[in-house]
A protein has these predicted regions:
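Non-catalytic, conserved peripheral segments adjacent to functional cores
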Residues: 1-92, 101, 108-110, 119-122, ...
Length: 151
């Protein structure tokens, strides 16, 4: 299947951070659900811009497509690069307060993943990075931050 077929088959819609998604389980603005899950599809010409979650852990699971790089900057400024694919890591855990972003390094095709967030995802605990603020915190990662932030 190609990206368009997955988007149609799974009923995906545009995501605020880039790519396409569909909530599968657990959106809970009351904070009572233990977790939430989504399908998330990223195309070669898009990215998941740097963002972080407060008080929530996110786990990404590879399903199909091209390898996906996930860039993670911890609060101390240490950068880790994880590649989700059939040949590399099949899942990656992102801890609360870590800035992270994702892209398809080959710039072709798409990648379909599943994401689980615990406790359940709440938009009030989601923060999209401001490029200038991230550059002040982590100037050593300037090239990556400039490429993986939207503003």
């Amino acid at each position: 299947m190609n990206a368009t077929e997955y988007i149609q088959k799974l009923g995906l819609v545009p995501h605020p951070e880039g790519g396409y998604y569909r909530q599968l389980f657990g959106n809970d603005e009351t904070g009572e659900k233990p977790l939430s899950t989504i399908y998330y599809l990223l195309t070669a010409n898009d990215m998941s811009a740097f963002h972080r979650l407060h008080n929530m852990v996110e786990i990404w699971y590879f399903h199909a497509g091209e390898p996906l790089n996930i860039y993670v900057i911890d609060p101390n400024g240490t950068l880790a690069v994880h590649q989700l694919s059939e040949q590399d890591e099949m899942q990656v855990v992102i801890q609360p307060e870590q800035w992270f972003a994702a892209e398809i390094p080959s710039k072709r095709g798409f990648c379909l993943v599943g994401c689980a967030v615990g406790p359940a995802f709440r938009f009030e605990n989601f923060e999209l990075a401001q490029k200038e603020e991230l550059l002040k915190l982590y100037p050593q990662h300037k090239t990556l931050i400039e490429r993986m932030c939207r503003e």
